[in-house]
């Protein structure tokens, strides 16, 4: 009796611990009991517990048809397993299912019932008492729904290692096996769902959203994960609010105010339906429309929110739903529900009343029978429903479940129901593994197996962790190390049904968590219906899109998603909208006008085909042609006096160097290459130095010839042709050394300059060393300066040697060109640098060619009469007379000044005719003064040998060459006449040479002694002040020569005058002339 009493006491405690009556549970006996937790109601009624009496369990309100369907799915799966011969044969599964009322407190009440029963069962009281009402232990629990509820349940069940398989709790916190040791689930965790939400926002190019989350273990972790994903994608969150079904009205209104004032059109919601319902109701009351709701799977298909009267607010919602499954026979099972037939389901009675809005007779504590049901109907009566305060009519019992549209019968997309079905089968397959376990291959110590008849919860948990089976849909079911079951999501869009006006969930895409990143999301935009029945994707950005060619610019104090569009700078581009930065174009490209792409830069250099390049090329070719023409003329007329007088060999070399100068300019035209860059400056420098070296040697040689007396063998030896070429080579060799050092140490190279202009690449030559270029040009200018000095010094030599004057002009042109070149070279860039240097080379080359050779070519071709030996001698004699006359004029002025100081008087010299004969006694006879001033004539006759006294016939002499030169001195003009006796050239030269030597002996220190042998009228007393500069002997060889003369030394004034047969000087009316003659 004692044990019997104890048994009844424990059973009573167990019964009381549950705090549930028969109508608040679904229960069926079996060999193995499975527990179930389902939200048959959405919440509990608020009650003030003032503790004036014994507290009672709160009442559940607002019936949940979908929760009842989920419960039906568990019962259907258990009955299907019990009827299956292949799965757990000879064993029966029972169940104990409780209503959580979507609250933690109710769920914990049910969980305590499971735990207490297991503890009582562990005492093995059956051995001591006959307990017919003994209930086996609950070896596993299916549930709960919300993550917050499952968290509380898991903490309690985990203490006793009772496996919990949830069908709808997706919080990622539940994957923590250190805290939730016995928790498993047949739904993916929210980590994938949050990532999928961020992918959708990125897909539609939204970046300005708001977030709302339930203030529980489902909403907070889910929205936190979403924030992390949004930050990685540069998605900004305008507001973030927490809600709860227990929030007061003021809190709800504050959240609604935030939503109403926000510019974000997209709102991401991590919440369950019950928690979100109060907020949606307030939004509907305020008629806030135009928002796009992005729903998590917990409310994406919630019947609380998906109501037709809310559609103008929530229409167009994009939500995530679990992959729909198929449960064969489940539809028929749902249709068979009836209070009289569902004897083990205490929730069927309330379901029937809520479905048909009627009430059933309150009966006994147990399930209603048909008689009781009918008797209650006959007796009538009424009661207040726990979900309504209105009186309802009695139910007839003949109502047709198919005639009423409720969420219970919405079996088209079985998602949560299928997860419940899968959870039950997972536990069944774990029990099957225990049932079929072979000793030695088990999961326990030493491969042992559990006893299926005495199986414990922890043993089932062990087999669940190693579960692997194939579902009825052919999918492999296995839990990972975190107890999660991987799965995919369907993307649904809320539409309004045209048939009955209800909200339907149309599948518009899917999210595959197993695919590669970037390939997981698929959306069919054509199927989406947005808020307001629009097909256009709504705009939910803080700023308008920045078009291609612009970038996003940060606004101070604003989130990164709020920006201004800034045009890309030149040289950068963006080819996409909302570019965060502009990409820099490659070096050889530049941005187009709109900065949307890069186009190839224009390549610019001094091209052969452009007008400027063509013009320079034509001028260079013209210079080459003219130089070649001059060279041809000089070769053809190489034996004429004018060619010989210019030193034929040096002239040929000079013309060759000018050819090189003109040719070197062509290296500056065309696209610069490394080899052209290394060749053009040395070619130009060496060519010009060779040219100027030739001019320098020629000018210096002529100057020395004209300053010398009658040329000696010394002059001929040291100023021979070999020495001239040696000097030219030495001068040129210095330039070659400079170029060689330059090319070895810092060789020039082609260079693509991107910095001068943005849209143009200038291909130029990088000189390598500006110092080397300075040395090259500086050395050239140094030689040119020396050449200019000698040319200027010999500018007054005889007219036929007047190339010194033209060389002076050419050197002036050379200096002007290159002095102008320096600032022009420094101030230009790109192709104009080469153009400036080409112009300088051509200008200098044309100056040298024109000044030195054009006059000679003109005489050779068009004035052949001047290209004779007589012309050369005539101009040379005139030059000698000029020198003597200047000396005489200077001395006459000095004598006049002396006479004036002594009181003497001077009169005009009368005109006279003087004849001078050469003899040894009186080489300079004094002329007789005449009384009357007449034109004067000075005649020199060469002494003739004595002839016999008897007259003899004289042979007719050949007419001798004769020339006249007018010389102007002050106010007077002197006409100089000169004739030559060619047959007596040698004798005359010998005689005059002897006479010259006698004069030199007397006037060795006089500056005019070089001309005294030629001018018998010249005074023997020299002016000590006369210098070489005063004689005007600064110039180059420019006169005509006798064909037999090979050297300019033969054209010196002394030799020319000594070769003359006679000369006559006449003039009149000039004191200067008279003084010159009488002196």
Swiss-Prot record:
Query: Where do the segments described as Arginine-rich retention motif lie?
Result: 890-898
Which spans are transmembrane here? 611-636, 649-668, 675-698, 723-745, 770-789, 806-828, 833-854
Q: Which gene encodes it?
A: CASR
Q: Which residues are glycosylated?
A: 90, 130, 261, 287, 386, 400, 446, 468, 488, 541, 594
Where composition is biased (Low complexity), the residues are 892-918
Q: What is this protein called?
A: Extracellular calcium-sensing receptor
Pro residues: bias regions:
945-954
Species for this entry: Sus scrofa
Q: Which residues bind spermine?
A: 238, 240
Complex formation:
Homodimer; disulfide-linked. Interacts with VCP. Interacts with ARRB1.
Stored Pfam families = 7tm_3, ANF_receptor, NCD3G
Reported modifications of this chain: Phosphorylation at Thr-888 by PKC impairs coupling with G(q)/G(11) G-proteins, while it does not affect G(i)/G(o)-coupling. Phosphorylation at Ser-892 by PKC and Ser-899 by PKA promote plasma membrane localization. Ubiquitinated by RNF19A; which induces proteasomal degradation.
């Amino acid at each position: 009796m004692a044990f019997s009493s104890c048994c009844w006491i424990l059973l009573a405690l167990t019964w009381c611990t549950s705090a549930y009556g028969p109508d608040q549970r679904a229960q069926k006996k079996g060999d193995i009991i499975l527990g179930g937790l389902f939200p048959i109601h959405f919440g509990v009624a608020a009650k003030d517990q003032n503790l004036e009496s014994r507290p009672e369990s709160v009442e559940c309100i607002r019936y949940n048809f979908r929760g009842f369907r989920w419960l039906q799915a568990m019962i259907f799966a258990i009955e299907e397993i019990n009827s299956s011969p292949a799965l757990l044969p000879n064993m029966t599964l029972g169940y104990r299912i409780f209503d959580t009322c979507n609250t933690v407190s109710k769920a914990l009440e049910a969980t305590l019932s499971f735990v207490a029963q297991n503890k009582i069962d562990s005492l093995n009281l059956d051995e001591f008492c006959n307990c017919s009402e003994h209930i086996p232990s609950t070896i596993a629990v299916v549930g709960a729904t919300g993550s917050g509820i499952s968290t509380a349940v898991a903490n309690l069940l985990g203490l006793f290692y009772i496996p919990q398989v949830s069908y709808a709790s997706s919080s990622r916190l539940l994957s923590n096996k250190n805290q939730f040791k016995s928790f498993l689930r047949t739904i993916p965790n929210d980590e994938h769902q949050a990532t999928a939400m961020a992918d959708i926002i990125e897909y539609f190019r939204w970046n300005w959203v708001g977030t709302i989350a339930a203030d529980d273990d489902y909403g907070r972790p889910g929205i936190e994960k979403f924030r992390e994903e949004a930050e990685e994608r540069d998605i900004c969150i305008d507001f973030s609010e927490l809600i709860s079904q227990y929030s007061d009205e003021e809190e709800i209104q504050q959240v609604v105010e935030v939503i109403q004032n926000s510019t974000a059109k997209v709102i991401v919601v991590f919440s369950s339906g019950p928690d979100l319902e109060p907020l949606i109701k307030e939004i509907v009351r305020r008629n806030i429309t135009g928002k796009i709701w992005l729903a998590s799977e917990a409310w994406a298909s919630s019947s609380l929110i998906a109501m037709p009267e809310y559609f103008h607010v929530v229409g167009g919602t994009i939500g995530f739903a679990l992959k729909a499954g198929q449960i064969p026979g489940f539809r028929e099972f749902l249709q068979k529900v009836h209070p009289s037939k569902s004897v083990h389901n205490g929730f069927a009675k309330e379901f029937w009343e809520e479905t048909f809005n009627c009430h059933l007779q309150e009966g006994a504590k147990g399930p209603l029978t048909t008689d009781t049901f009918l008797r209650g109907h006959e007796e009538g009566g009424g009661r207040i429903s726990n979900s309504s305060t209105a009186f309802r009519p009695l139910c007839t019992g003949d109502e047709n479940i198919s005639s009423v549209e409720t969420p219970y019968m919405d079996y088209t997309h079985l998602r949560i129901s299928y997860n419940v079905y899968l959870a039950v089968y997972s536990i069944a397959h774990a029990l099957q593994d225990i049932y079929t376990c072979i000793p030695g291959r088990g999961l326990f110590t030493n491969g042992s197996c559990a006893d299926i008849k005495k199986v414990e919860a922890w043993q089932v948990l062990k087999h669940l962790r190693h579960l692997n089976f194939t579902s009825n849909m052919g999918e492999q079911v296995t839990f990972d190390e975190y107890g999660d079951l991987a799965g995919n999501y369907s993307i649904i869009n809320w539409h309004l049904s045209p048939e009955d006006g209800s909200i339907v969930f149309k599948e518009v895409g899917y999210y595959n968590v197993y695919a590669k990143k970037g390939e997981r999301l698929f959306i069919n935009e054509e199927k989406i219906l947005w808020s307001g029945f629009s097909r256009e994707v709504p705009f939910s950005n803080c700023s308008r899109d920045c078009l291609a060619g612009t970038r996003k610019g940060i606004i101070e104090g604003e989130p990164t998603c709020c920006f201004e569009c800034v045009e890309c700078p030149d040289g950068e581009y963006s080819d996409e909208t909302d570019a965060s930065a502009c990409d820099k174009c490659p070096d050889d490209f530049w941005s187009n006008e709109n900065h949307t792409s890069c186009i190839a830069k224009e390549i610019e250099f001094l091209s052969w085909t452009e007008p400027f390049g063509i013009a320079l090329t034509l001028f260079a070719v013209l210079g080459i042609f003219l130089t070649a023409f001059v060279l041809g003329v000089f070769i053809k007329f190489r034996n004429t006096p004018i060619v010989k007088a210019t030193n034929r060999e040096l002239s040929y070399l000079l013309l060759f160097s000018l050819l090189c100068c003109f040719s070197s300019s062509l290296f500056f035209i065309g696209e610069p290459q490394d080899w052209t860059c290394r060749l053009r400056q040395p070619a130009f420098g060496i060519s010009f130095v060779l040219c100027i070296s030739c001019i320098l040697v020629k000018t210096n040689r002529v100057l020395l010839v004209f300053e010398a007396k009658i040329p000696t063998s010394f002059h001929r030896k040291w100023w021979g042709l070999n020495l001239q070429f040696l000097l030219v080579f030495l001068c040129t060799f210095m330039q070659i050394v400079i170029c060689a050092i330059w090319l070895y140490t810092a060789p020039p190279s082609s260079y693509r300059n991107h910095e001068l202009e943005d849209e143009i690449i200038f291909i130029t030559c990088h000189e390598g060393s500006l110092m080397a270029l300075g040395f090259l040009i500086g050395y050239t200018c140094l030689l040119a300066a020396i050449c200019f000095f000698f040319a200027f010094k010999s500018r007054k030599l005889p007219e036929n040697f007047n190339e010194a004057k033209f060389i002076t002009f050419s050197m002036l042109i050379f200096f002007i060109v290159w002095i102008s070149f320096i600032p022009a070279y420094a101030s230009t860039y790109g192709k104009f640098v080469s153009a400036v240097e080409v112009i300088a080379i051509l200008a200098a080359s044309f100056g040298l060619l024109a000044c030195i050779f054009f006059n000679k070519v003109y005489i050779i071709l068009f004035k052949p009469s001047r290209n004779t030996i007589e012309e050369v001698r005539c101009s040379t004699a005139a030059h000698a007379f000029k020198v003597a006359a200047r000396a005489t004029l200077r001395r006459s002025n000095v004598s006049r000044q002396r006479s004036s100081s002594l009181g003497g008087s001077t009169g005009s010299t009368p005109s006279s005719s003087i004849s001078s004969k050469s003899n040894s006694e009186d080489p300079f006879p004094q002329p007789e003064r005449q009384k009357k001033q007449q034109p004067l004539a000075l005649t020199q006759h060469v002494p003739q040998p004595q002839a016999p006294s008897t007259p003899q016939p004289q042979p007719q002499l050949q007419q001798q060459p004769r020339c006249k030169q007018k010389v102007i001195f002050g106010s007077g003009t002197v006409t100089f006449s000169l004739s030559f006796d060619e047959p007596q050239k040698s004798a005359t030269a010998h005689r005059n040479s002897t006479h010259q030597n006698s004069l030199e002996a007397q006037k060795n220190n006089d500056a005019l002694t070089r001309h005294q042998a030629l001018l018998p009228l010249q005074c023997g007393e020299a002016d000590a002040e006369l210098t070489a500069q005063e004689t005007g002997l600064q110039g180059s060889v420019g006169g005509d020569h006798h064909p037999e003369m090979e050297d300019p030394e033969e054209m010196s004034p002394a030799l020319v005058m000594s070769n003359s047969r006679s000369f006559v000087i006449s003039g009149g009316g000039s004191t200067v002339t008279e003084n010159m003659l009488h002196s």
